Amino acid sequence: MKSELHIIRNAKPEEYGTAGQLMVQVYSQLEGFPKEDEQPSYYSMLRNVGDFTAKPDTELFVAVSPTGNIDGSVVFFGNMQYYGSGGTAIQEKNAAGFRLLAVNPNTRGAGIGKLLTVHCIIRAKELKLQQVVIHTTKAMAVAWKMYEKLGFRRSEDLDFMQEKLPVFGFRLKL
């Protein structure tokens, strides 16, 4: 997928570290989101986000600027069995999911988060799946609004607690 300024594609192995560092930067700056000293294992997972690609049907997408900067990333799961979050999401059948969407703070407002999200939706349709499952938190208010505008609907059956953090589930029927 392509925008006027960014191309969305699979990350190359040599880009995994950059994508992970971007995720750490973005998530650690979210007001109301746990910091690294509160959830060190979560931040370790972010740093090592490329490890997800070793799982079947799992892809790391990046938004690449014309100058080669990685300005966004997201992990796509073509099989919810490998989604790896809390709650019941891993039991969803005929569904895709995505997690860990992050956009460079210097490029926010340019539609990169939407491009990455739409790319995941298109990928789920290519795989002939019936729904896309995601999670977000209250700290991610901008993403929450974007997901709703794209047609995602709250699904309380997917909610869970990540230590002390409430995590809210959403579905998009395809």
List the model feature ranges, each with a label:
Residues 10-17, 21-100, 104, 117-119, ...:
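Acetyl-CoA-dependent GNAT
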Residues 29, 109, 122-126, 153:
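Conserved amphipathic alpha-helical interaction elements at protein-protein interfaces in regulatory
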Residues 117, 124-135:
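Conserved GNAT acetyl-CoA-binding A-motif
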